[in-house]
Structures are given as C-alpha cells and as structure tokens.
C-alpha cells in the first residue's frame, strides 16, 4: 500500500534499564498488525524527559517474549489469581496510580489491617 504503520509510544520520563517499554511497544505493534493486516518491523519510543526518539526493531525475539507474557497472564486469569505487585518509586509516575490494586493489597493479613485502622484513630 501507500502507507506504512509505525507505532510511536510517548513516555513522560527517560529510557529505562529494563525492556518494559520495548515490550509494550512490541505488544502494540502486534495488535496493530492483527487489526490492520500488515507487518510492522519498526517502532519508536519517544521520551519526554530527554526529548529523544529511539528507533526499536520489532524482532521475533521480542514478539516471542510478549507471547510468553500473554500466556502467563492468561494462566493467571484461568486460575483466578492476581499476583502481588511490589510498589516502587516508579509507581508515583504511573498514569494508573490512582486506580492501582497494589495499594488495596498492602495489608497482608486481617490482623495488620485492623491494627492499621486502630492506629489511625
């Protein structure tokens, strides 16, 4: 065709040491490929903090890693299990921080919850 689909993921901060941003971009590319019946070999990550755009090759290895994560998520869903999440300093910059479940599950036991409630009064 006349057009090529190229996903660009905008991030507020700066590049991370882990591959989470690349995995997110890869997952988006995979969804777009299915929706638009096309191949997406490349995408970009734009970081607001550094005002820099980084080219990302959408490789078979990254696609396989995304599929592996999808399978793991589906297994959790089938078991009706929600894994615990550890809050980190990056949680404060997350767009979902006000709706996030880890805050709800911070008290590990009923006893800890009751003690916390009594201490607040």
Where are these regions (language model features)?
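Conserved catalytic cores of phosphodiester-cleaving nucleases, focusing on short active-site segments
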Residues: 1-15, 27-30, 94
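Metal-dependent nuclease catalytic regions and adjoining charged, substrate-binding loops involved
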Residues: 33-121
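Catalytic-loop motifs flanking and including active-site residues across diverse enzymes
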Residues: 24
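Short, conserved glycine- and acidic-residue-centered signature motifs
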Residues: 21
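Short histidine-centered catalytic/ligand-binding loop motif
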Residues: 9-18, 55-60
């Amino acid at each position: 065709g006349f057009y090529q689909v190229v996903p660009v993921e905008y991030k507020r901060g700066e590049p991370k040491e882990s591959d989470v941003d690349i995995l997110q971009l890869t997952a988006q590319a995979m969804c777009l490929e299915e929706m638009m019946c096309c191949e997406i070999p490349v995408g970009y990550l734009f970081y607001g903090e550094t005002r820099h755009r980084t080219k990302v090759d959408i490789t078979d290895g990254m696609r396989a890693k995304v599929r592996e994560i999808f399978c793991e998520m589906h297994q959790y869903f089938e078991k009706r299990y929600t894994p615990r999440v550890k809050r980190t300093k990056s949680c404060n910059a997350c767009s979902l921080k006000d709706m996030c479940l880890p805050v709800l599950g911070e008290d590990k036991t009923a006893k800890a919850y009751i003690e916390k409630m009594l201490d607040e009064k």
